[in-house]
């Protein structure tokens, strides 16, 4: 995990103290799952050059894997950075609805994919049948299942969400992704982007938190989850350009979570004598401004002109 450090009295010290403790890769909690909707190889490399320490999973969204040029090269770029990559669940559904599940397995094998997402957001798969797909896939790859419809008209109850999540975990899913889409307006979210708080809290009562990845593509949603479940909550559908902003939210270095994690005091502490001495030493090396009496620079300039 990259952090900002400064050299003080010959030792490297964290630049900021009392930051929330963040997990490091390979993580079991605090996962950030990024959605790639068609990045080029160069764009993938650029993303990792600045954000690799903070990314755990990358999903090639919906069916984009079928249209990605240099797919093998991009997959290699991600794997070389210790990032788990998988294809969006909609692609799984596209194979299943055409009765091509065996072709899907071959496609995963051909691309050396070690994780697969099983979802039923675009067309309904009965829970028992979906669990059978999970059991089948789990014999070949690591399975992430996704629960929740992509339709705004879905009216599944909290009890139905909990039943589906626990059934899919029992069938062999490593974790369950709670649906919100890349728009953040369905599933665990309302059409205006607000979190369905009662639903989320009810799910969290009955499912281990480390088994849940909450889709939260919008900043306010991310902040809500971090304030509700802590800096190491697992979040998904994060846009590539939001990876570092999300890390600042997790660390309390953005307004939305600043007060949650800052060691607030009534007034800023007085600078320590040691720091004052360091500043004085640094100033002596770069020189000090020269003044004539108590006159300001502008006064001196006016007189000379």
Give residue ranges: language-model regions.
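C-terminal alpha-helical cap/extension of soluble enzyme domains
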Residues: 8-18, 201-305
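Active-site mouth loops of central-metabolism enzymes
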Residues: 28-41, 61-64, 86-100, 146-160
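Conserved anion-binding
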Residues: 111-188
